[in-house]
Amino acid sequence: ASSDWSSDVCSSDLGENLFELTDDELAILCENTTIFAQLSPKQKAKIIKVLQENGHTVGFLGDGMNDLHAIFQSDVGISAEGATEALQEAADVILLKKDLNVLEEGILEGRKVFVNMSKYIRITASSNFGNILAVVIASVLLPFFPMTSIQLLLLNLLYDVLCLILPWDNVDEELYCKPRDWSGKTLGRFMLFFGPISTIFDLTTFAFLFLWLCPTISGGTFTSLNHESQQTFITLFQTGWFLESMWSQVLILYSLRSKKIPFIQSKPAKPVILVTIIGIILFTIMTIIPIGRFVGLTKMPLSYFAFLLLVVLLYISLVSIAKSWYVKKYKELI
């Protein structure tokens, strides 16, 4: 909204001039007129309906009984605290003070929350798709499940808890300066594009764990071990993938939250940084303390964390490259 609203006025018109217009003429007039004055209740509702038919989402602010029809017709009915009781009952939003800046701030905050919700849905969907694809491939190649069902549920629960902070994340100005439609049309494209990248690094982790780390600690390849040693092998493997999945899902938020370069061109909110770092530390500690044993997790050697750090850095780098290509082709990310 402009601080000097008069400079945004294109033209104005009176209600008495609308009677002779056809529907097509009125549709054109509504698109090119900023102020209508001296309108009847039916004309107010008619203009709102025309704007809706033109593809707009329309809010209407009223305070008297003659605004009731327009309030019902609008997508968002707005009233003030001192308005008639019937109008307040019909309105979706009631202003507690006479200040239109409240509406502007509310709209902008709503758009920011909407963008952050879109971030969560897209990033979570792509991560889950990548994990599912990795599980399917691993189920064919491995003699055991790469992660138990309770571990998968715990991983998703912990990730969702961390993502509760996302509504307070910073949003790039170009993402909320204009209205955005709630649509899942590009969700599948985003998921299919970024999900398999996660799968590549999941499979890389599988290979590292199955062919080197687990045999080294357990004392041999899986098929050559006795039952007890095989259980140790499986626990190490599942813990390794649990950590890799958790680290990669959380840290990739920073890369996919904006089409800009993270921390340089687009800085996440401090609470988001704090919560994600604390979350990673706590969930990593969970694999060390006794409580982790109840869900089949165990302590991993330091050599694994060196590998984990390398994998996560490579994953973020590849996603950043893919993101640049994606934005260049589709002109958007979120």
What are these language model-derived features?
Residues C214-T216, T239-I334:
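C-terminal transmembrane module of polytopic membrane proteins
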Residues S7, S12-F60, S74, S79-I261:
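Membrane-embedded transport module
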Residues I71:
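Cytosolic ligand/metal-binding cores
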Residues A1-D4:
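Short, exposed "boundary/linker" segments that immediately precede the start
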Residues S6-S7, G296:
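Glycine-centered helix-boundary capping/hinge motifs
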Residues N66:
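Conserved Rossmann-like nucleotide-cofactor binding loop
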